[in-house]
UniProtKB/Swiss-Prot annotation:
Membrane spanning residue stretches: 11-31
Cell location: Cell membrane
Annotated protein name in UniProt: Probable transport accessory protein MmpS2
Induction: Transcriptionally regulated by MmpR5.
Pfam (any one): Mycobact_memb
InterPro entries: MmpS, MmpS_C
Predominant location category: membrane
Membrane topology summary: Single-pass membrane protein
GO CC list: extracellular region; plasma membrane
Organism per entry: Mycobacterium tuberculosis (strain ATCC 25618 / H37Rv)
Alphabetic keyword roster: Cell membrane, Membrane, Transmembrane, Transmembrane helix
Length: 145
């Protein structure tokens, strides 16, 4: 059988923590009532306004050259990869985005000795490259256009 004094010896630390917590809680409660924290605060909130969208960006990808067809892969403004095989040249596609910045990429390869690519953002040519080699491969890239 466990004696009462043995139980007190084992539980004194837990008992001390409980007493300190209760005394501290009562003290904080009294301070809150003295400084009026229990009153409901008045908060003035401005009406919610819609965040204006960024000016839309029109991104145009173009591939051209003497070949009749080409393999094309491009990364759109939403970071989705599009792969197209045997596309008739000249080729172009335009996408629109409201992202504040665009990072796009275009790669093209043909069976001819020359191929060119171009990326246009809002009417301005941001990158244009041409490659001359057997089975020509070229790429264009725009970051934060």
């Amino acid at each position: 059988m466990i004696s009462v004094s043995g139980a007190v010896k084992r539980m004194w630390l837990l008992l001390a923590i409980v007493v300190v917590a209760v005394v501290g809680g009562l003290g904080i409660y009294r301070l809150h009532s003295i400084f009026g924290v229990h009153e409901q605060p008045t908060v003035m909130v401005k009406p919610d306004f819609d965040v204006p969208l960024f000016n839309p960006k029109r991104v145009t990808y173009e591939v051209f050259g003497p070949a009749k067809t080409a393999k094309i892969a491009y990364l759109d403004p939403d970071a989705r990869v599009h792969r197209l095989d045997s596309v008739s040249l000249p080729w172009s596609v335009t996408v629109e985005t409201t992202l504040p910045a665009v990072s796009v990429n275009l790669m093209a390869q043909s069976n001819a000795d020359v191929i060119s690519c171009r990326i246009i953002v809002n009417g301005a040519v941001k990158d244009e490259r041409s490659e001359t080699s057997p089975r020509a491969l070229t790429s264009c890239q725009v970051s934060s256009g």
